[in-house]
A protein has these predicted regions:
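Helix-loop-helix hairpins and the membrane-proximal interhelical loops
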Residues: 1-50, 163-165, 197-280, 421-425
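Helix-loop-helix junctions within the multi-pass membrane cores of secondary transporters/permeases
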Residues: 2-36, 58, 78-88, 92-140, ...
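Helix-coil boundary and interhelical linker segments in multi-pass alpha-helical membrane proteins
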Residues: 38-50, 89-100, 239-242, 340-342, ...
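Loop-to-helix transition at the N-terminal end of transmembrane alpha-helices
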Residues: 44-64
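Transmembrane alpha-helix interface/packing and boundary motifs in multi-pass membrane proteins
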Residues: 62-75, 184-190, 248-255, 286-296, ...
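Membrane-embedded alpha-helical modules
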Residues: 94-208, 212, 322-430
Length: 430
């Protein structure tokens, strides 16, 4: 029965190992339960409690889909980077409502389902040069780290120089710096659940500093009625919607591909041809989770690279994912603990996760300037203009223009020409 439901193979693992692996993965990725409400509550009409519940529910739905459909040992939850794009670019930067952004996420999920069913996913993936794929991940990492420093008050607005160092002796900045040191030590020592432990320890330190409020430990789950199925179709045909949907789709797709390839390679569960088994089913689980997540009020749900920690513990089947989902279900009743966490305590995690996401930068061929210049533009523009999508658009435009002018036509796919023209028109007319 377990084999049929989860792809469980008793010759490769045990039920106990699978559940321990699930608990390990949950501990390493559960920081999203603190970070997501902290981010989304900055938008009017999105209460922290409701966002906490929707985040946990999205993780439960996605991870259960991965367990029963994908039969893989991966955890899913609203993605870091994707949530930053939702809040800071679409809503705060472009000025759209969170309802507009949720609609974009919903459309992206539907498109992802169609692409998975029709196998067009590979064509889109192959259309983007690898240097830009790596640059996008690195740029998002830099952007997330910048947001963390800003939320902590370490980096502040300056009318003369745009930004400057904040008052680092203030309570918030000081707590964030202490938390960064603690979390950094835990990461260096490879402590399982180091990010979550770092958040909780920093939160505890914030109590005598007057920065952490105590709400209790256990409560019934918060209602999501304020954010449930709040889709907005007014601007669904606008070019901005196209750009936002494309960005969500692009990041989600490569997040999932990168995680599946990396973790499956580490787990040695590739087939004889070096391909991921049941990859189509894993993508379908991701797409379903994103679509459902938009309906319950959260950003794009994606596969977490932290799943590698559970794989290292011995997780090999969907039973590990089932255990992760059970942990998220239990966490619904511990919202007071997560909602008491101040922004200064989540800021260190944003910085550390930013570091993790910067790792693809080493794969960019910096000696090949036709590749590295557009890649650098992609990376640097995201934090500089406070927009993930603008970083992607400017990187793609510069890649096409530079290589066309240098007669490197073979490097440019037809899809890249089309995208570059559309993006240029966006900047001209919108």
């Amino acid at each position: 029965m377990l084999k049929k439901l989860f792809g469980f193979d008793p010759t490769k693992t045990t039920v106990r190992t699978e559940f321990l692996a699930g608990l390990t993965t949950f501990l390493t990725m559960s920081y999203i339960l603190a970070v997501n409400p902290s981010m989304f509550s900055q938008l009017d009409g999105m209460p922290e409690g409701a966002v906490f519940t929707s985040t946990a529910l999205a993780a439960i739905v996605g991870t259960l889909a991965m367990a029963f459909i994908g039969k893989m040992p991966f955890g899913m939850a609203p993605g870091m980077g994707l949530n930053a794009f939702f809040v800071y670019t679409v809503c705060m930067g472009m000025g759209y409502s969170w309802q507009f952004a949720l609609t974009a996420v919903f459309i992206e999920g539907i498109i992802f389902i169609i692409l998975t069913l029709t196998n067009l996913r590979e064509a889109i993936v192959n259309a983007i040069p690898s240097s830009l794929k790596n640059a996008i991940g690195a740029g998002i990492g830099l952007f997330i780290a910048f947001i963390g420093l800003q939320n902590a008050g370490i980096v502040v607005r300056n009318n003369s120089t745009l930004v400057s160092l904040g008052e680092i002796t203030s309570g918030s900045a000081l707590l964030a710096l202490i938390g960064l040191l603690i979390t950094g030590i835990l990461v260096v020592k490879n402590v399982r659940g180091g990010l979550l432990i770092g958040i909780l320890v920093t939160t505890a330190i914030g109590i005598p500093m007057g920065l952490t409020e105590y709400y209790g430990i256990i409560s019934s789950p918060h209602s999501i009625s304020d954010i449930f199925y709040k889709l907005e179709w007014n601007n669904v045909l606008s070019l901005d919607m196209v750009v936002v949907v494309f960005t969500f789709l692009f990041i989600d797709m490569f997040d999932t591909i990168g995680t599946l390839v990396g973790v499956c390679t580490k787990a040695k569960i590739m087939d004889a041809n070096g391909r991921i088994p049941r990859v189509k089913e894993a993508f379908m689980a991701d797409a379903i989770a994103t679509t459902v997540g938009a309906c319950i009020g959260t950003s794009t749900t994606t596969t977490y690279v932290e799943s590698a920690s559970g794989v290292a513990q011995g997780g090999r089947s969907g039973l590990t994912a089932f255990a992760i989902a059970v942990c998220f279900a239990i966490s619904l009743f511990f919202s007071p603990v997560f909602l008491a966490i101040p922004a200064a305590a989540t800021a260190p995690v944003l910085v550390i996760v930013g570091l993790f996401m910067m790792s693809p930068i080493k794969n960019i061929p910096f000696d090949d300037y036709a590749e590295s210049i557009p890649a650098f533009i992609t990376i640097i523009m995201m934090p500089m203009v406070y927009s993930i999508s603008d970083g992607i658009l400017l990187g793609m435009i510069s890649y096409v223009l530079l290589n066309v002018l240098c007669m490197n036509f073979k490097r440019i796919t037809p899809a890249m020409y089309i995208l570059a023209i559309l993006f240029i028109l966006k900047y001209i007319f919108i």
